[in-house]
Amino acid sequence: MSKDSAFAVQYSLRALGQKVRADGVVGSETRAALDALPENQKKAIVELQALLPKAQSVGNNRVRFTTAEVDSAVARISQKIGVPASYYQFLIPIENFVVAGGFETTVSGSFRGLGQFNRQTWDRLRRLGRNLPAFEEGSAQLNASLYAIGFLYLENKRAYEASFKGRVFTHEIAYLYHNQGAPAAEQYLTSGRLVYPKQSEAAVAAVAAARNQHVKESWA
């Protein structure tokens, strides 16, 4: 338990009349006071402690999702809309901050959420009839972000297969389209010139692999 979480537990205990030191260390005194509470109060304090890291992240313009939360939502949503779960597992670590036990993503600025969408792309998906919340709200939500990633995957798959008939839409190529947008992605696949070159090392490696796969298949 972090020091901030320990303080939250201890001050909650004191507010409930328990005599504990607020020192940011959960020792035998704090645990005994917690055990002495009725179950409903104990549960409320435990839930507060668990939610504190996420609340702190939001205050810092980031939100944190645990690996278990992401994996559970991906399994459900990928099956529902027909997008490979493995694609989500490929994309999310590239687009977000990998932290102990999960992922942190930005919820302010031009690019937001697990898919790092900008407003233009998000709103285009909504105009295409995809059932998504407004950009500010949806990009901070786990489920909405995952649906948006999947919906964009399906749109980009259609675009790729229309332009390059018979080619395999790999995860790397799907990520290239997600990262660059369909017109810029097609230009990169044919010319090798990246329209938006300012990317993380992981993103650059993924889009380079996409072009290598595309070119290799054209020689087959």
From Swiss-Prot:
Record keyword Plastid present: no
The entry's keywords: Cytolysis, Degradation of host cell envelope components during virus entry, Degradation of host peptidoglycans during virus entry, Host cell lysis by virus, Hydrolase, Viral release from host cell, Virion, Virus entry into host cell
GO annotation (BP), single: symbiont entry into host cell via disruption of host cell wall peptidoglycan
Compartments, record wording: Virion
Temperature dependence: Inactivated at temperatures above 20 degrees Celsius.
Coiled-coil residue spans: none
GO molecular function: hydrolase activity
Description of pH dependence: Optimum pH is 8.5.
InterPro entries tied to this protein: Gp5_sf (IPR038288), Peptidase_U40 (IPR019505)
Assembly and interaction partners: Monomer.
Similarity field: Belongs to the peptidase U40 family.
General function of this protein: Muralytic enzyme exposed to host peptidoglycan layer after membrane fusion during viral entry. Functions as an exolysin that cleaves the peptide bridge formed by meso-diaminopimelic acid and D-alanine. Also lyses the host cell late in infection to release the virions.
Protein name: Peptidoglycan hydrolase gp5
Gene: P5
